Amino acid sequence: MVAHLTEWGLRHFTSDTAYFAWQRQTVSAADLNRLHACIARKQAPGAGTAEETAFYDATAEPSLIPALYSQRYEYYLAIAPRVDARIGSARRILDFGCGIGILTTFFARRHPESLFVGVDRSSASIDYASRRAAELRLDNVEFHRIDVDREAVSGSYDLVLATHALLQAEQDPGIPSDRWESFARGGDVARQTAFELRTGLAPRLDRLLTMLADQSRMIVFEKTRLLARRVPFQRALAARGLRLLEPPEPVRYALVEEVADDGPLYVLGRPVQGSGIDWSEGPEEVDADTVNVDSLRGRPGSGEDPLYENHTAAAQMLWQSLPDRRVMKEFTREGQDGRQLHAELGTTQDLVYLYVANTFDQRQILLIEEARAGVLDCYFAEIEQG
């Protein structure tokens, strides 16, 4: 994959300073300004398909490609081998939302006996992908401009790939849990339908599934690591008869210096009844950390750093198991849309704790000695004031 990315002009950076210095050398200020204007229009209230397509057309400008896509260098290193290892005996592969074709052409090179068809709504991306495929002398890949939200793709396929394409509504928080104490979500059909429609997931999935041949598979990798997005996404897949063929795989990679916890990677199919792996709607398993209050006693503390903190789903279990837990003050705030935020300040033996939870699955617990209880008291006040 490294050689392939090099041919595309991409470079690997681990320093933001070095990356942005190179970006300034290779991209004109005028081009960056035009791109930023496209981003602003795409993110503006009321923006839709036209603004999103215009943004992706802009990112397919040849002078921008090396700098822009080098930010995703480690994303390609993480995803390409995982998908490549699962292509197997598939002979007709559809790459939905292929963009400029970096991954599509890599897979076509690796599997010359198979036909790869890349589709995308951005005409500029498709034009560039087609030119690159010709330059790479690939005769087993083709690219077509198709907006799957509105148009069908002809033919049937043994394998459908969708990486960062099915659920592009990154700003959509998903569906909240029933209460701040729980990670569970009830089976509200109206909320599920609304999620699928406002994110565009329903029409995309429905059209893609018409192209799956018998015993064919889907490999899907979307930004659904947060449970509030993962649960409705999985429910949409399950409602259409898709089952897991292997356990989902969360993936971590770097966007230069920023760490991205992404995915999971799903391998899906329509196996015979009774086979496949059951869906899980619980939080990701984390190390079952425990708090030994006795071990924290007498530990030196300084400044505003707590003696202990946990920001994972395990914080709820730790909070529930605190010995001699006594609440000093608490509040639960509920919005008009039903979202809840709970914060609680209390004591556990001779330590002070702060616990925060909301219906978007965020959990946080902090412990500090009584002498510095004011640190958590101030934090509690900030949360309460909103």
Per-region residue spans from a language model:
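Conserved alpha-helix/loop element of class I SAM-dependent methyltransferases that forms part
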Residues: 70-89
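Conserved beta-strand signature within the Rossmann-like core of class I S-adenosyl-L-methionine
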Residues: 188-193, 215-222
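N-terminal auxiliary segments of SAM/dcSAM-dependent transferases
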Residues: 1-44
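Conserved SAM-binding strand-loop segment of SAM-dependent methyltransferases
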Residues: 137-148
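Mobile active-site "lid"/loop adjacent to the S-adenosyl-L-methionine
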Residues: 163-207
